[in-house]
């Protein structure tokens, strides 16, 4: 029996994909196949017995749409968000939070074993949140038209169709007030939202940042024009909101999916807000990269600091340092910290943040980490000058390239702390680092081994997980 599109089947969910989709097999009785035909089905949990409709068929697998839960899994819950199945963000809301933490632990462990070749690795339970709601300090809200007029909310999963929704349960409640004020302003003054297909209209997105420790708020309206009609009237409305610190415009007239343009026009306040992670204060502008979950960021950075094992005498490199978030955490406990980041504005923020916190033992470089570090290394004459005690890397999803990893090991640090947002590329890089035999001259050969691993849940209700890994130098006999 051939599996065809639009057919319905009863399946039991036996596993989860790395994206959190349930995996169920159409039974061998129906197909006459030894192992059954696997389907990937969103919004299902291991243990669910579900009626699913086939929506896409590949050679060896397919995709199904959940039609009905026949027997729910013990780990299944009703999503709190009324639009959870439409939204592309919180894909795991049908799963208990405890089960999500287990899923993320398994995901990291499986990747480290399968891709990284770390067969005996034991990964501890994911560090989660006591209250995993209202945790995001940043929202990018798209505007558009629907049958009811101006709409604002979020994109439906894997589309650019806007679902009108003022509230998001992982964002601060104050965002609702801000969105209502912007929509009301647009309706009163006939300011049209952006039409993505035609490239017409003005208001594209509202970027909202909230300082969880300071209570400060920044609102940046992204517009498809050089100016916003009646901008003063919008500013008057927004500054009445308690905590409003900065109001600005971002100019983006390109027909692109990229949200922010390069130019920012300030309407009110300093054009940034301040917030804290631990004891470190940061200045955050509209275009700054800053972790969106400040509570778990502190957990993540404290774990990275613990793995770094600093005593105050170490020279540390922080690669992909952003606005200096990890760098400044490290600088409080290190002799010297060097940071590298490709975005010039981020390095300006990093230098400003260091000065703001009185940390004069930092130095920041603009450029690609895979270019800056090798160039710096080649210009140093002695092994002592080239040496780093600890190197911290926090790369984008693609991980590190081999040139950078080779330079890192050539600097023979005692410890490497790898912070990753993608456990698959993490595993690939760990395999490279642990299999590479390095030479330290007359002191002999050495290699790196994985000492500790810790997953951290930065994005509850999604399939994403951050991981911190400690590698230590092991002298060869």
Regions found by a protein language model. Give the residues of each.
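Short, aliphatic-rich beta-strand segments
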Residues: 208, 215-224, 281-285, 390
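Short, solvent-exposed loop/turn elements at beta->coil junctions and helix N-caps
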Residues: 124-132, 196, 205, 209, ...
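Short, conserved phosphate/pyrophosphate- and ester-handling motifs at nucleotide-, phospho-/glycolipid
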Residues: 47, 171, 293
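Terminal RNA-binding accessory module
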Residues: 1-79, 83, 363-364, 371
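Short, acidic/hydrophobic/Gly-rich beta-strand patch recurrent on exposed beta strands
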Residues: 22-28, 153-156, 220-222, 350
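Short beta-strand elements
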Residues: 14, 134-145, 149-157, 208-210, ...
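Extended interfacial segments that mediate partner engagement and assembly in macromolecular machines
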Residues: 67-79, 85-193, 228
């Amino acid at each position: 029996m051939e599996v065809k599109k639009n057919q319905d089947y009863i399946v039991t969910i036996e596993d989860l994909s790395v994206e959190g989709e349930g995996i169920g097999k159409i039974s061998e009785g129906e197909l006459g196949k030894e192992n059954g035909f696997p389907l990937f089905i969103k919004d299902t949990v291991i243990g669910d017995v579900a009626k699913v409709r086939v929506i896409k068929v590949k050679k060896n697998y397919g995709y199904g749409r959940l039609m009905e839960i026949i027997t729910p899994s013990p780990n299944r819950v009703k999503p709190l968000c009324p639009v959870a199945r439409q939204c592309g963000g919180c894909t795991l809301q049908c799963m208990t939070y405890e089960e999500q933490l287990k899923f993320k632990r398994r995901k990291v462990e499986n990747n480290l074993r399968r891709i990284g070749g770390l067969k005996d690795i034991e990964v501890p339970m994911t560090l989660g949140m006591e209250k995993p709601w209202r945790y995001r300090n940043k929202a990018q809200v798209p505007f558009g038209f629907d049958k009811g007029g101006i709409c604002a909310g979020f994109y439906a999963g894997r589309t650019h169709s806007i679902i009108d929704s003022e509230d998001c349960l992982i964002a601060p409640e104050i965002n609702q007030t801000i969105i209502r004020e912007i929509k009301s302003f647009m309706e009163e003054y006939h300011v049209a939202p952006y039409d993505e297909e035609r490239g017409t209209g003005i208001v594209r997105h509202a970027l909202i940042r909230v300082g969880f420790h300071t209570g400060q708020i920044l609102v940046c309206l992204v517009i498809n024009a050089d100016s916003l009609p009646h901008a003063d009237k919008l500013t008057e409305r927004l500054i009445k909101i308690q905590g409003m610190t900065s109001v600005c415009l971002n100019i983006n007239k390109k027909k692109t999916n990229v949200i922010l343009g390069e130019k920012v026009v300030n309407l009110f306040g300093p054009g940034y807000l301040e917030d804290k992670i631990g004891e470190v204060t940061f200045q955050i502008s509209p275009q700054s990269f800053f972790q969106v979950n400040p509570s778990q960021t502190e957990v993540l950075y404290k774990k990275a600091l613990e793995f770094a094992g600093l005593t105050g005498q170490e020279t540390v490199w922080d690669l992909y340092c952003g606005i200096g978030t990890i760098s400044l955490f490290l600088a409080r406990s290190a002799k010297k910290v060097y940071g590298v980041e490709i975005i010039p504005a981020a390095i300006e923020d990093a230098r400003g943040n260091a000065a703001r916190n009185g940390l004069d033992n930092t130095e920041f470089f603009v450029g690609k980490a895979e270019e800056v570090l090798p160039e710096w290394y080649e210009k140093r004459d002695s092994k002592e000058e080239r040496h780093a005690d600890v190197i911290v890397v926090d790369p984008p999803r693609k991980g590190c390239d081999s040139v950078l990893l080779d330079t890192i090991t050539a600097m023979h640090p005692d410890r490497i702390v790898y912070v990753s947002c993608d456990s698959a590329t993490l595993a690939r890089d760990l395999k490279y680092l642990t299999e590479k035999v390095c030479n330290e001259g007359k002191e002999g050969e050495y290699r790196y081994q994985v000492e500790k691993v810790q997953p951290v849940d930065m994005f509850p209700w999604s399939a994403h997980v951050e991981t911190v890994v400690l590698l230590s130098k092991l002298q060869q006999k």
